[in-house]
């Protein structure tokens, strides 16, 4: 008798995706982050669902409803902190996942890569709107500053900002619509993630060598299910350590002060995972220029496949490209640090130099080094 998992219409889909899926035999731990992102997403949806049961999206009660969740709801504090710190781990996994894609040339699967970029933008939008919901000082002023950037768009800018706000300032209407979108977007992300997987399974996974591995495939289960289970265990351990020992480590203390439109915090800054983009935004004196640089800092990923000049897919055997890649990582860490600093000397010039270096590495140096490496190998 044929196994039900291979014949049943629904079980067959799961079987072909997670059990009998042919996978390269040499994929490393860097390939674990896809499954970890899936776990993060499900965790965020579940904790978010329970938070939404007790949260009220009204400017007068939003802050106190979060306090109520932490003080009065059974295990509300742990749900709230798992959701907040889960977002941080989500972004850590996202950045490592994208970094893996850049290093090993996974961007040569254009459909999967482009859906991934859309996913990145959607997750960033969701996280930004979620940060506004507790209605603390940084929530309010972060929302005001970031939405106000759209006013830099010529001609329609001001109307666009007021349309998003639902009035002449960030107020009740803004909070309500942000809650609505913050609730619906994770389900859109889930759908996009399924499409992302669908496109990936059309081509099969890349591997560290960048060489087609069709002649050497192994079943996903048990090899990679066990490997993913270990990753999940370590992710859970990291999350719970963060939640139970230092839940506010990655948050901003200003967000424990209720939102007050009459009192501006000394340093308005977003969550840590947006600081690199925020530093690029601030490093350009012109408002419109800054907004364009901000958008380009992420959307530049879309043209990475066009800038691939090397005859090898992966960076595994390309030491010069490896040096540039790690320089890019160091540069992004520098930008993250600068984004959290006040706008004063020497941080301004460091931010400007780091921003220039970021675009120079991706647009000029990496393609040039690819050509140099081809010539060194006489290819």
Swiss-Prot record:
Q: Which residues cross the membrane?
A: 33-53, 77-98, 113-133, 178-198, 226-246, 288-308, 320-340, 347-367
Keyword annotations = Electron transport, Heme, Iron, Membrane, Metal-binding, Mitochondrion, Mitochondrion inner membrane, Respiratory chain, Transmembrane, Transmembrane helix, Transport, Ubiquinone
Q: At which positions is heme b b566 bound?
A: 97, 196
Taken from the UniProt entry, a GO cellular component term is: mitochondrial inner membrane
PROSITE patterns from the entry? CYTB_CTER, CYTB_NTER
Q: Which GO terms describe its molecular function?
A: metal ion binding; ubiquinol-cytochrome-c reductase activity
Binding residues for heme b b562: 83, 182
Q: How does it sit in the membrane?
A: Multi-pass membrane protein
Cofactor dependency: heme b
Task: Please give a single GO biological process term from the UniProt record.
Answer: mitochondrial electron transport, ubiquinol to cytochrome c
Which subcellular locations apply to this protein?
A: Mitochondrion inner membrane
Q: How is the cofactor bound?
A: Binds 2 heme b groups non-covalently.
Give the residues the record marks as binding a ubiquinone.
201
Q: What else does UniProt say about it? A: Heme 1 (or BL or b562) is low-potential and absorbs at about 562 nm, and heme 2 (or BH or b566) is high-potential and absorbs at about 566 nm.
Family to which the UniProt record says this protein belongs: Belongs to the cytochrome b family.
Oligomeric state and interaction partners are given as:
The cytochrome bc1 complex contains 11 subunits: 3 respiratory subunits (MT-CYB, CYC1 and UQCRFS1), 2 core proteins (UQCRC1 and UQCRC2) and 6 low-molecular weight proteins (UQCRH/QCR6, UQCRB/QCR7, UQCRQ/QCR8, UQCR10/QCR9, UQCR11/QCR10 and a cleavage product of UQCRFS1). This cytochrome bc1 complex then forms a dimer.
Q: What does this protein do?
A: Component of the ubiquinol-cytochrome c reductase complex (complex III or cytochrome b-c1 complex) that is part of the mitochondrial respiratory chain. The b-c1 complex mediates electron transfer from ubiquinol to cytochrome c. Contributes to the generation of a proton gradient across the mitochondrial membrane that is then used for ATP synthesis.
State what protein this is by name: Cytochrome b
């Amino acid at each position: 008798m044929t196994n039900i998992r291979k014949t049943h219409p629904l079980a067959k889909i799961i079987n072909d995706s997670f059990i009998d899926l042919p996978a390269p035999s040499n994929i490393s731990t860097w390939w674990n982050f896809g499954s970890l992102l899936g776990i993060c997403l499900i965790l965020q949806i579940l904790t978010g669902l329970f938070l939404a049961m007790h949260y009220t999206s009204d400017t007068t009660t939003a802050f106190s409803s979060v306090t109520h969740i932490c003080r009065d709801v059974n295990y509300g504090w742990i749900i709230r902190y798992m959701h907040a710190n889960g977002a941080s781990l989500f972004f850590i996994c996202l950045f490592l996942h994208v970094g893996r894609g850049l290093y090993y040339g996974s961007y040569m699967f254009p459909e999967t890569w482009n859906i991934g970029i859309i996913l990145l933008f959607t997750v960033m939008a969701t996280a930004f709107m979620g940060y506004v919901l507790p209605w603390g000082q940084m929530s309010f002023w972060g929302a005001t500053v970031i939405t106000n950037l759209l006013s830099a768009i010529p001609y329609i800018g001001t109307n666009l900002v007021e349309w998003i706000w639902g009035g002449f300032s960030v107020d009740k209407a803004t909070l309500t619509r942000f809650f609505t979108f913050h609730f619906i977007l994770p389900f859109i992300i889930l759908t996009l993630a399924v499409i992302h997987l669908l496109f990936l399974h059309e081509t099969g996974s890349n591997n560290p060598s960048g060489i087609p591995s069709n002649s050497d495939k192994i079943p996903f289960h048990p090899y990679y299910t066990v490997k993913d289970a270990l990753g999940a265990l370590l992710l859970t351990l990291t999350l719970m350590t963060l939640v139970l020992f230092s839940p506010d480590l990655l948050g901003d203390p200003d967000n424990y002060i209720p939102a007050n439109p009459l009192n501006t915090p000394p340093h308005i800054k977003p969550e840590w995972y947006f600081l690199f983009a925020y530093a690029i935004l601030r490093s350009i004196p012109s408002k419109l220029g800054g907004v364009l640089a901000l958008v380009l800092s992420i959307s530049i990923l879309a043209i990475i496949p066009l800038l691939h000049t090397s005859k090898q897919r992966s960076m595994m055997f390309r030491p010069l490209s490896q040096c540039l890649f790690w320089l890019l990582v160091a540069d992004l860490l520098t930008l993250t640090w600068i984004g959290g600093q006040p706008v004063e000397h020497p941080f301004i010039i460091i931010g400007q130099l780091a921003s220039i270096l970021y675009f120079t590495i991706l647009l000029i140096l990496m393609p040039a080094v690819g050509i140099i490496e081809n010539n060194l190998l006489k290819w």
